[in-house]
């Protein structure tokens, strides 16, 4: 079935700024509010954490450039499925797309859990009525009615925006990105007035936090321990190419290729400022003693600043939820077009231009989130990280092979350094994947996380088997000049 025969078509409304806010907002989210204390604990101080995030950004830049080159050359929704299919065939394309769908889709219920956790744990201290009706406990975590309802209302709003179309979702993303930046500016201002560089001393120390402790014995080991976590906190730049088919007419594709790298660099700078600002407000060894230190330290300084930051932190998860919702639906759309998922996944709503079936499936997954409890955050985090990096690595190898098999393909943007730069992306991705699967590595998945991965793979193999005799749908990728 050709593109023209598809039911409906994607709206072409997204500008370079829209793409930047989609990626940047997906990357930063509010993980920094919940995790900045853990970064310092695991690294043995804010200095080690900052160095790790710098290295992490540099590590992922070649991968971001690979996405930029391929997306500018082949700007279609869920392009990862297309790239791998053209180089390594339908089976590997399916595996890559299926795992990336897992990695991205997980972030939707993850963010819903984060909202309910902040409402119950932090707002619950201010307004005990929020914890007055307990529904049940799961994995030792209590689930309360009112925080669940509030998280559901936030999630439903994001779902509605994505059903309305890419333009509405992009407008929401722009607002949320500005809100997150306001929160960071607030933290910076407080650190300048109340804190000082002497508070980041000692440069390295083993400390005990509310829920974790430093296991590294040296600063170098601390940097490595944080470094293996950074791919998850930089995950989100891939949401930019997933919606490339909805780029506005006349978009400069050379600049588009640079947007992904810019989003990574901006996020790296954001994390640097975040870690330094919170690490210097008060002595960092005191800062990390609270359960959510980024908020707890503000509560002792000024209750109004605390409430302001808490509000920003609570609406913040809507940003990555929005970005990953849109990205995952486009991945499933691409897989439907390839015949890798049921035909209904290839259908686009004629009015809103959004993938109908994928949106419905993601809506169900997202609203389940608040009912799972906060103890599911860590397993979902690690599974998402592995799925994301595996897909990025496959895209990097596809980019390299496409340079050999399709040398004449128009490439408005190219990876700096050519094949050498692409090789660096392949190496970086492979190394991170190995760190996550080799026994003994600080980032190795545990039994629960492996069960999620293997369960998802089993479901995927069943679907693949059911569809193995179906003819792949033909879809012609538009060139940049035709988009």
Label every model-predicted segment.
Residues 40-44, 48, 114-117, 123-124, ...:
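Transmembrane helix-loop boundary segments of multi-pass membrane transporters
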Residues 146-197, 260, 264, 381-394, ...:
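Membrane-interface loop-to-helix entry segments
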Residues 5-10, 49-50, 129-146, 175-307:
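Helix-loop-helix junctions that connect adjacent transmembrane segments
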Residues 344-353, 392-440:
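C-terminal membrane-solvent junction of multi-pass transporters and transport-like membrane proteins
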Residues 475-482:
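Conserved small/polar residues in nucleotide/adenosyl-binding loops
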Residues 82-85, 89, 121-130, 207-214, ...:
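TM-loop-TM module centered on a large, flexible mid-protein loop between adjacent transmembrane helices
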Residues 12-117, 231-232, 237-240, 245, ...:
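Transmembrane helix-boundary motif of multi-pass solute transporters/channels
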Residues 38, 61-155, 314-334, 378-390:
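Hydrophobic transmembrane alpha-helices that form the core helical bundles
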